């Protein structure tokens, strides 16, 4: 058997291996032994090793013209050199090598086999086609790919990789080039191979210093994309260097590639060996000869690029010259073809569009300088679309790929021939002129690396310029100390999660794994705030990563966290329901790492209702800022709000809260938002969870900058944290950081995400953590020793192990039944809430003391006049009685805040807390001006809110928590609309104290009353609030007079009781003269009355029927009673619905010893209102009371009828039933 036909050019290697086999059979691999034993001779089937072909050699820059040669000097006798003589120049002529000794040497061994193969090759009738191909596009696109590889996975591609892949594609288009010739059974035969097996000609050094050529095969290349081809190519190369090629690697070559251009050869005709039909030779890359003396500037001006000469040597017996010529033309077209380069860029995950082959465009029409400026602006506005921000480097299935053709130079009528030309750039990068290549390099560095920035949508030019300058200046390299600090934070984040995973297997903790860069990011923002001399950072966040943040950012003791895992409650948590560990809050101090700053850090408690914490945290921050009262620039408490990507895009509370940012009653000087974008929501992918391209696209609607940052680049993450904090301080606006990362585990630690995201978790499983990657980077750069890296992790683990053991040794305390919070706070009984007559007059006079030149609106002036007179003459209505409470509290030095939709005027045109001059639009808040005149820091602040209940109520709740000494009231436009804030009511208002020990004195003012306005303007859902009442969690009231409302508000504000107050306020009663109060009700009546007995009972002994009622229905029943002259009926008003004033009710009932019937009369349907709650609890509290019967509308699914006549009929029937004999 001929080794030449099977192994081609590698036949010499077979001979060498066989000689080794003859000397020592064990010295060759098993495959070779089996082959030689089967063949029994040296010409058995060969095997090959291969080394990497060298890349085509680039020519140097054109050399300057050589100086004329000097005339030869006459030979003279040498003398000692003078000390001052100049040193002689060394000759630039290379020293001539010594010629070998003449003689004759027999050729043996390898070279004998090679010579034999060459003789055999002469039997093949070959022909050669030659083609010069433009190489400019290869230079540009190869550089783009290699830049991307340098920033991501490392490595590079060579020209030979590209040409080899183009060769495979061309063979696929011209399969005849893959054929070969052989003689089988004495007959000429055309061989058509099954696959395209590309042979790489590799020059291997031998032990004796000589070199030998082998050809190794990349098999089945037609099935590969470029990335696969590159991997197979590099595998062959790597194994050839290590001598690890197998016999199979040397066999089956169908076409070969050789690259003499690597040593500067421009054109060669390689030999074709038996068994192959084609061999391609690649020459060096150089400018055409006639331009090799031109300067770079001249070459750029002329648009001259380098060429590469490629030859196709083929077996003329099976391949015709036309086919070979077409083959080379196809290769040339591929190397300048858009789709070929698109395929390579896609396979290599290069986010940019490849450079395109194009003819040079003359500088006519629109000036090219203008086009370059347009390109710069395109990158500023859309460069983020191709930024390398996704650590998984993949496109989510179903998500459309954005169009970023604006970033292609071709879009701007620029071509590759413009890259080295100089253009005016208007100060970009601090220069007036640059080459297009320099411009692209700077633009990509600023806008397309690990940070993608969106800021050009911002309307304010100063903001845009500030951001532009910092982004285009680039990210400064951290110092070695800063790098070690970043690594320390990553170590802490990862070690904490690993420790919990090991010690508490299966317990839910919603780990941060995959997003550990959040810890250095938050630390960076807080550290920057500390350096700015600010007072506090308040954090709001969901449950994912919360434990890690509590420990590594807030500084919560490890022992406390471990105790929670052990089920042991801290002392402060005893009583109440408690909550899961990943809902709890805490606070600590942050010491600036590279400075002297120090700042308080607090984490707000939150429920699992995602994003519900947003408005609450903002309210807390605003309260703290108002308490510090540092003026316009005093927003020294920083809100830092964390989100999940799916929640941020999906939940309406997000834009509701962001919308508050620049409103005067809600501005907190900017919030730093971090979206922890792990690219999944539980099991839902982005294509099913948002219609926006980015989860953060809401932010742009509010004119805020967004920074998308790769979570696997901690240095970029830290820089963005600093930049965002600086922007917030400079411009007082919200700023958004989209931290693109992944979730290592499922939604919780017991979940298996591969069930729903198999492809995503193929990429995640086994992936190196960001800490490991960063450690390798620092080790590779020499910035850290391996010992230091290991010591940090070990010390951190030892610290946690020590605390863990202490907790374990402390022993588990036996769980105890929770006692509740009922006994911790009591209603104040002895507190007097009246004011003096002098203060009452002063409050009334405030509406007369208008600023000079101020005029009331014609419809408001009578209201102001009535308020001045009513404090002496009587007839104080509801709105004025309420304002008297707020104004008197502000007078005493308290901060009173009232906010809601239309609260300044009042939904029903009743309040007029702030008057507006119709001519000048000047505002006048009489009670605030009065409080300010006292000089005791009292304030009465009234704000119209945005049209939101959820965010509005949440903000006011947060405000009441952030400043417990303030009096905070949130008013609904109609009480019905409070259900838009049901999450705040359920999760915070009613249960915050029980779950987290978080107290609040928030007041909810909810207009409620059945006046025929329909099902959405009648009921504040009294039954729902009462259902939430337990353990004294809330005070719920429905006062019937302005004075009692006044006393209730003042009692709530002046007492030490810290619980929310829910008041169902009236609508029709606002102008009901029967419901007005006298001045003495504010000055002489000293307390709130939880129950008001019937004042119109002449003889209690005559009373046979007692009606229990609340709200405006009292006045309708009283009117009917008077009309009918019913002295056998007593109407008792329950003013406080919870806690149930059972003693006062019992006393009232006891005052009617002959009563035979107790009616509970209410406007609301039977299944709503106070009745269901009172039916259940009142008999338990008053065991001996007469049987109680309900009188109300029938049970309904809706709250009220929307038909006025039906409403009137229902009300008449209800009252008639109450007064039945």
Curated annotation (Swiss-Prot):
Residues 22-107 are annotated as: Disordered. One of its GO terms (biological process) is tricarboxylic acid cycle. InterPro entries: 2-oxoacid_DH_actylTfrase, 2-oxogl_dehyd_N, 2oxoglutarate_DH_E1, CAT-like_dom_sf, DH_E1, KGD_C_sf, ODO-1/KGD_C, THDP-binding. Residues 41-89 are annotated as: Linker. CDD domains: TPP_E1_OGDC_like. Gene3D superfamilies: 3.40.50.12470, 3.40.50.970, Chloramphenicol acetyltransferase-like domain, Multifunctional 2-oxoglutarate metabolism enzyme, C-terminal domain, TPP helical domain. It catalyses: N(6)-[(R)-lipoyl]-L-lysyl-[protein] + 2-oxoglutarate + H(+) = N(6)-[(R)-S(8)-succinyldihydrolipoyl]-L-lysyl-[protein] + CO2; N(6)-[(R)-dihydrolipoyl]-L-lysyl-[protein] + succinyl-CoA = N(6)-[(R)-S(8)-succinyldihydrolipoyl]-L-lysyl-[protein] + CoA. Disruption phenotype: Strains lacking this gene completely lack 2-oxoglutarate dehydrogenase activity. Deletion of odhA also causes L-glutamate overproduction and accumulation during growth. Inhibited by unphosphorylated OdhI, but not by phosphorylated OdhI. Pathway: Carbohydrate metabolism; tricarboxylic acid cycle; succinyl-CoA from 2-oxoglutarate (dehydrogenase route): step 1/1. Changing residue 258 to A: Loss of E2 succinyltransferase activity, but nearly no effect on E1 dehydrogenase activity. Keywords: Acyltransferase, Magnesium, Metal-binding, Multifunctional enzyme, Oxidoreductase, Thiamine pyrophosphate, Transferase, Tricarboxylic acid cycle. The active site is at residue 316. Residues 338-1221 are annotated as: 2-oxoglutarate dehydrogenase E1, C-terminal part. Its cofactor is Mg(2+); thiamine diphosphate. In the N-terminal section; belongs to the alpha-ketoglutarate dehydrogenase family. Catalyzes the E1 and E2 reactions as part of 2-oxoglutarate dehydrogenase (ODH) activity, to convert 2-oxoglutarate to succinyl-CoA and CO(2). OdhA has reductase activity with 2-oxoglutarate but does not react with pyruvate, and also displays transsuccinylase but no transacetylase activity. Since OdhA is not lipoylated, the succinyltransferase activity of its E2 domain is dependent on lipoyl residues of the acetyltransferase AceF. This is 2-oxoglutarate dehydrogenase E1/E2 component. The lineage of its organism: Bacteria, Bacillati, Actinomycetota, Actinomycetes, Mycobacteriales. The gene is odhA.
